[in-house]
Each structure stands twice: as structure tokens, then as C-alpha cells.
Amino acid sequence: MINIIGAGFGRTGTLSLKLALEQLGYGPCHHMDEVLAHRETIAAWTSAAEGAPVDWDSLYGQYRSTVDWPGARFWRELADHYPSARVILTVRDPEKWYDSARSTLFQAISNRPARMSAEAMRVITMMNLVVWDGVFKGCFADKDHALQVFAEHNAAVQREISADRLLVFDVAQGWGPLCDFLGVPVPGEQFPRLNNREAYAAKHRERVVAAMSASGVQP
């Protein structure tokens, strides 16, 4: 059952939060990386983005927490379905968030190879429905629009989730606020800080090569 709902957009420190939650005993934690690793769930997330009813318990299975997209798209539904779950809104400087998302996530979708495997195209279709069309209405490239969506999303979460249930969290703050919120001891290890642009770009290149190879295309 889901105990922690991450409502923050991708590129707000969600991978660091995933690893931190798992270290604190709230794992496994769902993240877009989990969808890519378990692609049998792509159809269910696509259907959810199209408005079909969702069996959240079945979809999440053994996961105890969820962060990043696709889950963050459905924060309202998840907060209703799991009324005892706590909500964490990861935040980041809006300009830095946009520049990071544009140069990683959006670029990965925009600069894809002409030929890809059917499975890779299913991933892209899901991402478009959940994020680029579903959240940004196909206008992420319009910076002003994207920043407005980002601000309105963060405001809505803070308006609709009660203060005693919500943590607004910048991962730069480290363990302190997170552990206080969850009522757990601060670990002796450093707070995980991962998923910078360079690491993301290298990871994306690996995925592109894999998708092209699956299509019979020489990378």
C-alpha cells in the first residue's frame, strides 16, 4: 500500500527522494525508472492518462511510495485513494527546473530517432499522454506557459492537501525536514544527490541505443 505520495514534477529531485525514501524504509518507491524497468505497466498508465478507471492497488502492487511521473500526474486521485498517505511536494527554483526539464526530459522526447521499436514508441506515447500533453497541453516549449503550469501545480497541491499531511521539500535541505516529517531518525549516510544533467544525458543515450537495436537499426 502507498504510504508516501510524491506530488512534485520530474526534475525536482525526485530520484534523490526515491533513494532517500527507500533508505528510510519506505521502499520500494515507484518512479519513472520503474516504469522503464517494468514495461508491462505502460498500458495501465496510458489508460489512466486517457481517463480510464484505475485499480491503484493493483497497479502499485508492492510499492510503498511513489514519486516523479507518472504518479505525480495523479496526485489528487492518489491522495483520495490513500487517505492515510503523506504527501511530499518536491520544489525547485522555477527557472532552473525548466532549463533542466527542457534539456533532459523534453529533449529526450523531441530528439528521438526516426525509427524505434514498438515498445519504445509505447513508452513515448505514454509519456506524451501523461506529461507533455496531459500536464502541459502540448505547449512545454512555450517557457512562460510551462512555468505557469509549474507554479499553478505547486500552488494547487499546497492549497488542497492539509498542512499536517504535506511536506514542501527542496532536496537541497537534506535529511532534516524529511526525517522530521516522517518521524524517523536521521541516517548517518549523506543524503543521496543524483540525476544531474550529464548523468541523465548518458543514461538517455543508452536507452536510445537499446531502442534502436531492438528496431534492427544500427545506432
What are these regions (language model features)?
Residues 1-61:
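PAPS-dependent sulfotransferase catalytic core
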Residues 6-8, 32, 67-71, 91-92, ...:
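Short His-Asn-centered micro-motif
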Residues 22, 26, 34, 49-60, 73, 77-168, ...:
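PAPS-dependent sulfotransferase catalytic domain
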Residues 34-43, 88-97, 115-117, 152-215:
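The conserved 3'-phosphoadenosine-5'-phosphosulfate
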